[in-house]
Amino acid sequence: INYPPVKIDRAHQLVAGKRQLFREMLALGCQFISPSQHVADAFNSLYGPGRCRIINNGIDMATEAILADLPPVRETQGKPKIAVVAHDLRYDGKTNQQLVREMMALGDKIELHTFGKFSPFTAGNVVNHGFETDKRKLMSALNQMDALVFSSRVDNYPLILCEALSIGVPVIATHSDAAREVLQKSGGKTVSEEEVLQLVQLSKPEIAQAIFGTTLAEFSQRSRAAYSGQQMLEEYVNFYQNL
């Protein structure tokens, strides 16, 4: 569930009570798993080494079946098609509003496609798709893109990145622990906001080369294996067998 951003932040008032609950659960023998290294590190720094294990997110089997049906798109026609995806496009924590407006200001150099509710972005070079609940339609639309731009500062191990990368769509992500961790798994890197504005004007193969240091075909093959749901399943099975 994606909750709207709160107007009053009460989190700091609740932290002590929640940490006590975690300590009580650990005393009962509860085991904790995080999909990301940076969250596990933060947890272990509070509650002790090895208290939280890591199993990265992967593509679920239903999505795997959808991805298998999508033909790889090596070259797109016309100007670069750039996707921005979020549940609520107004929320600056998930979508850097200023960065999107700077991309819009590139005019006819790019075609910006937004997927999500309440898009505040309107311009001649913007196509608003709305919130797409059908995973097959969303993946099919993303498959036609040259890149996905990801600027969230509040994610853990974002599944949309795994999904886009799995179908061979390069991800141009601004610096964050979450994006860095996901991209590293397929040999990619995060970039500055200034670099985003340069990269979105390139072709799909050029973006793959710049972010992943390899050809589009090699990047696609590497990513397909890196975010496999089968790998995630095997890690969970192994975890439960060793309890």
Question: What are these model-predicted stretches?
Answer:
Residues 75-121:
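Conserved catalytic-core segment of nucleotide-activated headgroup transferases in glycan assembly
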Residues 153:
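Aromatic "clamp/platform" in nucleotide-sugar-dependent glycosyltransferases that forms part
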Residues 70, 198-201, 205, 209-242:
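A charged, aromatic-enriched C-terminal amphipathic alpha-helix characteristic of glycosyltransferases
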Residues 38, 58:
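Carbohydrate-associated surface elements
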Residues 12-32:
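Membrane-proximal helix-turn-helix segments that form the acceptor-binding/catalytic region
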